[in-house]
């Protein structure tokens, strides 16, 4: 298998006044440095894991849940699937000194960005998957902002576990095109599974745990673009929400 798709887009974030790394779909990043990890999500999901004792944290960005991953595929292709993306993130954090039993999770994304795509439900499937996966791994979700119809911009500070989210306008350049491609991929994967005609015998999947109810603070964005306030809690500012550790 090829090298793991670690995010390489480094920059300096003027809003948070610290170095940052931008994650694209299928990428991940882990570190104990005082930086910010940033990504933009539609139906995709980003899981942010943090060990509050060691100060190590990381983020991934996956596009589809646990369907269709090929054990012989390149790592960059496998990372699009949640099962592989979560396994990589957890394992890399453990390699860096984190302890699984201390991990805390904050999860974002899973929006229904494309109108009329209710039959595929990529966002709902991704949201349900990440909740079930973390429940099975006994990793507590301390905050979440999942589903809905708006794309999100997520910032995560891996050293402290602080996470912030901003709801974006429905029509964000590049997001709609990516969502359309995801819908085509989901249809292709479904057709491939039907052709395989493999019957699996397994225990019923556990239902997803109830959504986390985090405390949310809001912060302003320098860009000045109006965001949509999360439905979890009303707040004064119309910008991004701070999902703090406590």
Swiss-Prot record:
Reactions accelerated catalytically: L-glutaminyl-[protein] + H2O = L-glutamyl-[protein] + NH4(+)
Single GO MF descriptor: protein-glutamine glutaminase activity
InterPro entries linked to this entry: CheD-like_sf, Chemorcpt_Glu_NH3ase_CheD, Cytotoxic_necrot_fac-like_cat
Domain of life: Bacteria
Renumbered residue ranges of the record's region Disordered: 225-246
Any one GO BP annotation for this protein: chemotaxis
Keyword set includes Hydrolase: yes
Annotated SUPFAM superfamilies: CNF1/YfiH-like putative cysteine hydrolases
Reported function: Probably deamidates glutamine residues to glutamate on methyl-accepting chemotaxis receptors (MCPs), playing an important role in chemotaxis.
Entry-linked PANTHER family: CHEMORECEPTOR GLUTAMINE DEAMIDASE CHED-RELATED
Family: Belongs to the CheD family.
Name of this chain's protein: Probable chemoreceptor glutamine deamidase CheD
């Amino acid at each position: 298998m090829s090298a793991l798709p670690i995010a390489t887009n480094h920059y300096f974030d003027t809003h948070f006044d610290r170095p940052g790394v931008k994650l694209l779909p299928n990428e991940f990043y882990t570190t104990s440095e005082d930086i910010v990890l940033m990504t933009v999500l539609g139906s995709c999901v980003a899981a942010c894991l943090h060990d509050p004792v060691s100060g190590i944290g990381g983020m991934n960005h996956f596009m589809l849940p646990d369907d269709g991953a090929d054990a012989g595929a390149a790592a960059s292709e496998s990372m699009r699937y949640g099962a592989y993306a979560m396994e990589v993130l957890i394992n890399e954090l453990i390699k860096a000194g984190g302890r699984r039993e201390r991990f805390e999770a904050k999860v974002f994304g899973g929006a229904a960005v494309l109108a009329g795509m209710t039959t595929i439900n990529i966002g709902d499937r991704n949201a349900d998957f990440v909740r079930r996966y973390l429940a099975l791994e006994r990793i507590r979700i301390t905050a979440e902002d999942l589903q809905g119809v708006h794309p999100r911009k997520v910032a995560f500070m891996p050293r402290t576990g602080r996470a912030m989210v901003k709801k974006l306008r429905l029509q964000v350049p590049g997001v709609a095109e990516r969502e359309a491609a995801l819908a085509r991929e989901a249809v292709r994967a479904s057709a491939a599974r039907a052709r395989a005609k493999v019957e699996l015998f397994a225990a019923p999947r556990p239902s997803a745990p109830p959504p986390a109810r985090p405390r949310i603070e809001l912060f302003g964005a320098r860009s000045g673009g109006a965001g949509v306030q999360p439905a979890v809690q009303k707040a004064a500012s119309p910008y991004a929400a701070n999902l703090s550790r406590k």
